[in-house]
Regions:
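Metallo-beta-lactamase
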Residues: 70-121
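Short internal beta-strands
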Residues: 40, 64-71
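Active-site-proximal beta-strand elements of phosphoester/diester hydrolases
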Residues: 1-2, 17-20, 100-106
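Metal-dependent catalytic neighborhoods of phosphoester/phosphodiester hydrolases
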Residues: 53-62, 71, 77-80
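Pre-active-site segment of Zn-dependent metallo-hydrolases
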Residues: 8-48, 53-60, 110-118
Length: 121
């Protein structure tokens, strides 16, 4: 746990996956995580700034994929390119590096930059 809703998962295969990478500006984030040394993939659960956080900057710095709900993926693709993003719907799953990820329902609003970004997952 990296504070707030941010998590880093190091898989048994050695992959490093960040979920909701709100690092800078997150008062609970450990100082050692403010400038990650490696990011292999990013998952963003919904469009609020405290969940999207540093996803765009990290994706650019590490050329890693960002997986997000369809509507949010469209907005992120406009910033980092469609080749670095992948859309997934609630209930859908994806093989991500050495792991499998399934989006599940979450009761929460979702917007980014004033735009609706799909259901939270």
């Amino acid at each position: 746990w990296l504070g707030h809703a941010a998590f880093r998962f190091d898989t048994p295969a050695g992959d490093r996956i960040y979920v909701d990478p709100f690092l800078k500006g997150n008062p609970s984030c450990p100082a050692s995580e403010l400038e990650p040394e490696r990011v292999d993939a990013i998952l963003v659960t919904h469009g609020h700034d405290d969940h999207v956080g540093d996803a765009v900057a990290l994706a650019r710095a590490f050329a890693c994929p960002v997986i997000a709900q369809v509507e949010l993926r469209t907005l992120l693709a406009a910033e980092i390119g469609s080749d670095m993003t992948q859309a997934l719907n609630k209930g859908g799953g994806i093989d991500l590096l050495s792991s499998h990820v399934t989006l599940t329902h979450a009761n929460h609003s979702s917007s980014h930059g004033g735009s609706y970004t799909g259901e939270s997952c």
